[in-house]
């Protein structure tokens, strides 16, 4: 843990004291995540990627001023992903704000082998079809068998990969060139993997994994 971080929230104090040991436990605690350092501590191998940079000029009394709006995705490549937007007069502070917001928006997703063509039981794809939307953009993500890869657009591929999805089919509609809405639609679709209720009495043909997993073979995806 960083020596500079002094937890200020109840969740932060529980993490610092070792009472909460995983990101999954932190999210399931229902306590608000307001300190990005919690994510840094519980997911030390988190990766980040800038997926959109927008620059806008506006006239002021002192002349033209540039404003940056930057979108960043973070993930551990194993069941956790977050998306954030940051705005500032300069690029570096905007990226930092976006990175912090992405960490505060971290979520746990479900994975599995939802493709009837595969049935390997590993956490390589989506457990079932999910849909997401943002603005005019609508996206559908479908499970795919091992080896297909990510048959989606570049932005969706970046988000799915950093979330730990290796194989998927995707179909998008609307103004998909609006990168921010496209990214948010993908993020919202992944959020649906954890919202679907699964009847505990149903016997699943393949396992469904939440968050970071170790496959049945004993090897981590």
Curated annotation (Swiss-Prot):
Keywords: Ribonucleoprotein, Ribosomal protein, RNA-binding, rRNA-binding
Superkingdom of origin organism: Archaea
Family annotation (InterPro entries): Ribosomal_Su5_D2-typ_SF (IPR020568), Ribosomal_uS5 (IPR000851), Ribosomal_uS5_arc (IPR047866), Ribosomal_uS5_C (IPR005324), Ribosomal_uS5_euk/arc (IPR005711), Ribosomal_uS5_N (IPR013810), Ribosomal_uS5_N_CS (IPR018192), Ribsml_uS5_D2-typ_fold_subgr (IPR014721)
Gene Ontology, cellular component aspect: cytosolic small ribosomal subunit
UniProt GO molecular function: rRNA binding; structural constituent of ribosome
Domain S5 DRBM, residue spans: 46-109
Recorded family membership: Belongs to the universal ribosomal protein uS5 family.
Domain notes: The N-terminal domain interacts with the head of the 30S subunit; the C-terminal domain interacts with the body and contacts protein S4. The interaction surface between S4 and S5 is involved in control of translational fidelity.
Subunit-level organization: Part of the 30S ribosomal subunit. Contacts protein S4.
HAMAP family on file: Ribosomal_uS5_A
Entry function: With S4 and S12 plays an important role in translational accuracy.
Protein name per its UniProtKB record: Small ribosomal subunit protein uS5
Species assigned in the record: Thermoplasma acidophilum (strain ATCC 25905 / DSM 1728 / JCM 9062 / NBRC 15155 / AMRC-C165)
Taxonomic lineage: Archaea, Methanobacteriati, Thermoplasmatota, Thermoplasmata, Thermoplasmatales
């Amino acid at each position: 843990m960083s020596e500079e971080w002094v937890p200020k929230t109840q969740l932060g104090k529980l993490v610092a004291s070792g009472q909460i040991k995983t990101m999954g436990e932190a999210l399931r605690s229902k306590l608000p995540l307001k300190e990005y350092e919690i994510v840094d501590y519980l997911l030390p191998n988190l990766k980040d990627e800038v997926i959109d940079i927008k620059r806008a000029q506006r006239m002021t009394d002192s002349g033209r001023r540039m404003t940056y709006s930057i979108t960043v995705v973070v993930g551990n490549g194993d069941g956790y992903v977050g998306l954030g937007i940051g705005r500032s007069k300069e690029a570096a502070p905007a990226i930092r704000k976006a990175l912090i917001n992405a960490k505060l928006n971290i979520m746990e997703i479900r994975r599995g082998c939802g493709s009837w063509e595969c049935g390997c039981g590993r956490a390589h794809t989506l457990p079932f079809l999910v849909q997401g939307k943002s603005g005019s953009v609508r996206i559908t993500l479908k499970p795919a068998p091992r080896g297909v890869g990510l048959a989606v657009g570049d932005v969706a591929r970046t988000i799915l990969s950093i979330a730990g999805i290796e194989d998927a089919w995707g179909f998008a509609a609307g103004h998909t060139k609006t990168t921010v809405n496209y990214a948010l639609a993908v993020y919202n679709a992944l959020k649906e993997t954890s919202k679907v209720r699964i009847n505990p009495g149903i016997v699943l043909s393949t396992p469904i994994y939440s968050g970071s997993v170790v496959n049945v073979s004993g090897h981590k995806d």
